[in-house]
């Protein structure tokens, strides 16, 4: 009997230890927040950017507004809300923006715990930050949401695709560019952990669902780029998302591109797609 009890105990430990581990440290497997460095301040200053401060349930948050390089009267013709990957920071977008349309303005949004932002990230809190950042931008520009909404587009990479789609859905944004999107976080868990551990996922980002909602908006125009050699999020996920909405979504698989180098490799193509997607706002 003692031997049987020991065996049962060992089996229970073998079953529940991974479960407890995954539930306890799941956020650390998904999010990789970092503080800003001196070089980021230099990038912000060179771009003539300003901080846009706001508060959410997670405390004080900071996004960054980058004005158009081209002089313009009144509000910018297009404002891109940009959401980075889970290991990047909002100001990292500034390595690319100089090569894109000079009429574009940008609101670079960090997640809770990233950069200068307090709190801890979850899908709901990231969604809250996107909405609150947009509201803060309207005040910063002295505009109304109704004035900014038709001028707004979203751009996301990796995890930022989920954030961008949530913002697009919440703000009724029709112009979307996504780089290396996943289908759902549970699908990603299946790749990394297998079944059934993938269903322990507490951070249930669902790009299938959100993309379907955004694609249903009249006039929606969505472009997806995905590296053919992406070693983190397989390109079949990007293809699957696009295939569900062929009338609205254009898919580009990029030969030779990996997960973290796609932005640098095809920055020019991305910029051209952004100009095309936002064409109605730029006319």
Question: What residue spans do the PLM features occupy?
Answer:
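An N-terminal hydrophobic leader/cap segment in hydrolases
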Residues: 7-54
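Membrane-embedded segments
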Residues: 60-136
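Alpha/beta-hydrolase fold nucleophile elbow
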Residues: 143-158
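Glycine-rich nucleophile elbow surrounding the catalytic serine of serine-hydrolase chemistry
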Residues: 155-166, 232
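Hydrolase active-site cap/lid region
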Residues: 161-214
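Short beta-strand/loop motif that positions the catalytic acidic residue
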Residues: 214-219, 223-230
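C-terminal catalytic histidine-bearing segment of alpha/beta-hydrolase fold enzymes
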Residues: 236-283
